[in-house]
Design a protein with these regions (language model features):
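Alpha-helical sensor/transducer elements of the RecA-like P-loop NTPase core
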Residues: 1-3
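Amphipathic alpha-helical "lid/sensor" segments that cap RecA-like P-loop NTPase cores
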Residues: 6-49
Length: 177
């Protein structure tokens, strides 16, 4: 006999499952819920969003002359979402200074592409010295940066959950650090 979990018995389960699958693949931008868009249209929208973010928003925010190192960092962080941040390793990988990596990470945070999640320790002093994690805030954008079309790693799932908690906490103005 097959015993189903309670939530699967709910009449709304198929709709909830479809909504979850959509969210997992395309993220949370409202434009992507347009029912006239097919799957390919949504991927094109996400790719365009990432390009617009780089070409217009980042240039306006920090006046970068060369976007290549920034794009490399953005991709490296997307690959490492949900992981501890190692600034030195990222600097070596991208070919820039640690100071530049820290600036770029700050730009990603200010533009709501990522958040830094401090390690959790009861002792506030320890919390300051422990290595934080970095999380991408939108799974659809993450997928576009990595040129993926579905599928999710454990770290990507962790980032999806962390980003939702972060958004909900910010919505009610709770301190999320």
């Amino acid at each position: 006999n097959l015993i189903l979990p309670f939530f699967m018995l709910d009449k709304r389960y198929p709709q909830m499952k479809n909504a979850w699958t959509h969210y997992e693949r395309f993220g949370a931008y409202p434009a992507l819920t347009d029912e006239s868009m097919d799957e390919n249209d949504r991927y094109v929208w996400l790719d365009t969003y990432v390009k617009t973010y780089l070409e217009r928003d980042v240039r306006d925010l920090v006046a970068l002359r060369d976007l290549e190192p920034y794009m490399k960092l953005q991709r490296a962080i997307a690959l490492q979402t949900g992981c501890l941040i190692n600034v030195s390793s990222l600097a070596t990988e991208i070919g820039v200074s640690s100071k530049t990596v820290k600036q770029y990470i700050e730009y990603l945070n200010v533009s709501f592409q990522t958040i830094i999640l401090p390690s959790w320790e009861r002792n506030q002093q320890k919390r300051l010295v422990k290595t934080p994690k970095i999380h991408c805030l939108d799974n659809g954008v993450l997928q576009a940066i990595l040129h993926k079309r579905g599928g999710m790693t454990g770290n990507e799932f962790e980032s999806l959950v962390v980003s939702e908690i972060y958004k909900q906490a910010n919505n009610i103005r709770a301190n999320v650090n």
